């Protein structure tokens, strides 16, 4: 694109739509006035406007009787995820059977997993084709739950995400997210009105480091969940996600404490 930097800091591989087709009950830090039931025509407008850059569309299947039809209509054009949903086990299983293949920040903005009501989490466990996002900032999920999820569902399905918002890397204070005021205190971001978690203020490198040091997941597993697994989700593993001949030379070098030492971008050394 015009104005491209000589050393761009990152490649934009796609956009993830976590709305507007979500549940008002599980809206998290989203403005309820923007929420609508899943709608094929609206989704197609987003895809057209983004020129194909939208790669994931999240839906709350319990909020619309047309959810299965929506998935069947859209699944060949975009990946469908379950996001900010109040669905029960059967509703989630029907969505996954129809072609939904991704779970947005598992455990957050969905019903809790219990022995009589397994909900979305139980449906994800029973649907081996579904990839699983985890926010491993040591705020959103307890370390024991992270370990249990890896054991129950398998590391090959885990995708580490930051879920970070605009205040990431900024001092404590008040910021905005989608028009809503957010209070940032340390590594926690919450809505000023109501106190709900409002995304995170961490980054993916810190999440990977936390997975290893706090949650006790092996380093090689954590790295794959931050690199190879997301690349496979996006369908770009032939270019990204591992250090292999013929792939992009995008590499981060860490020391023995997992602190960043160097970034290599496109085979160049823009950041030392």
Predicted regions and their residues:
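Short, Lys/Arg- and Gly-enriched loop/turn segments at beta-strand edges
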Residues: 258-264
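His/Asp/Glu-enriched, well-ordered alpha-helical/loop segment
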Residues: 122-134, 138, 150-162, 167-254
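Short, electropositive alpha-helical surface patch
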Residues: 1-6, 69-79, 218-219, 223
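Electropositive phosphate-/nucleotide-binding environments in soluble metabolic enzymes
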Residues: 36-40, 64, 68, 89, ...
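Active-site core of metal-dependent hydrolases
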Residues: 48-172
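Divalent-metal coordination cores built from histidine and acidic residues
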Residues: 1-53
